[in-house]
Structure formats: C-alpha cells, structure tokens
From Swiss-Prot:
This protein's encoding gene: rpoZ
SUPFAM superfamilies for the chain: RPB6/omega subunit-like
EC id: 2.7.7.6
Family the UniProt entry places it in: Belongs to the RNA polymerase subunit omega family.
Record protein name field: DNA-directed RNA polymerase subunit omega
Molecular function per GO: DNA binding; DNA-directed RNA polymerase activity
SMART domains the record matches: RNA_pol_Rpb6
Disulfide bonds: none
Keywords carried by this UniProt record: DNA-directed RNA polymerase, Nucleotidyltransferase, Transcription, Transferase
Record's catalysed reaction(s): RNA(n) + a ribonucleoside 5'-triphosphate = RNA(n+1) + diphosphate
Species of origin: Aeromonas hydrophila subsp. hydrophila (strain ATCC 7966 / DSM 30187 / BCRC 13018 / CCUG 14551 / JCM 1027 / KCTC 2358 / NCIMB 9240 / NCTC 8049)
Pfam families: RNA_pol_Rpb6
Species lineage: Bacteria, Pseudomonadati, Pseudomonadota, Gammaproteobacteria, Aeromonadales
Biological process (GO), any one: DNA-templated transcription
Amino acid sequence: MARVTVEDAVKQVGNRFDLVLVAARRARQIAVQGKDPLVDEENDKPTVIALREIELGLVNNQVMDTQDRYEQQEQEAAELAAVAAIAEGRG
C-alpha cells in the first residue's frame, strides 16, 4: 500500500480545507455512486484512493463539477425522452 502524504495532495488543491471537501466528494463517488477509480485500488479504502487521485492531479473540484454537469444533462435528456414517449402513447 502506497502512503499518501497530505502535503503532496494539498499542493494540487490549494489548502487543507478544500482538500478535505474534494477528497470526501470523490470518495463518496467511488464508494456510494460506484464510480471507477482512476488509479489501481491496491486494496485501499475509497478515501485513500481519492487522495491518491488528487495527489496525481487526476481529480480536482473543476473536473468533478464538469463531470457532474455532464451527468445531470444526460439524466435530464433521458427524463425528457421518457416523458415524450409517454406523451406519444397517450396521443
């Protein structure tokens, strides 16, 4: 298991407080939402995986915001298509 130093991850994010927010958000994506890790899992917990991704510069707040917006647009498009299909069935 590779050690993650907070100092290296802080350099990527800017400060410790933002690091906590970004790491928690990414760890939730991996653990709860089933997102695929961008690094090898190596039997690490989601929080360690998130910190390793941040340390390598693979994940930051902007990347996650962009991904969330894209997924939101996909979800809205799917919902509109479902509503249109239901409306066609009634018409």
